[in-house]
Amino acid sequence: MHFNLLRQRLRSLGHDYGDFPAHAGLWEMAEKTTGDVLARMALVPRLLEARGLDATPPIQRRLEQAGDMASARVLDIILHDEIGHVGLGDRWFRYLCSERGREPESTYRDLLSRFKAPRPITPMNEAARLEAGFSAAELAALAEKV
């Protein structure tokens, strides 16, 4: 769905998907975490997709300042959906931590370090992250490390 929304918007502006450079961070992290579902849940939805929660509001503000309300609305839809994606990853991460007898917040920090993962984007979208399952204490600890 997100691909179709973005592609439709790009086409309405005279472009298409693939016309602009993009990073492969999600795919690269998925490859790095092959074989460890706990690391995958920590670092794909809880880190990289959560970074999208943080990055979206500033991008929306820039689009709105440029008068591109249609693109900002597309990002509203995606942001709402991504909260659910991050939340699903959070629930699986916490379940797997419980199954392995691991404390989630320290495990998350350990995995960030072990995989040399990028840090959260600041300012963090705390409301979206809380809705997705992060605790206020965890957000405070992450903010200190950034």
Residue positions per predicted region:
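Non-heme di-metal
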Residues: 1-146
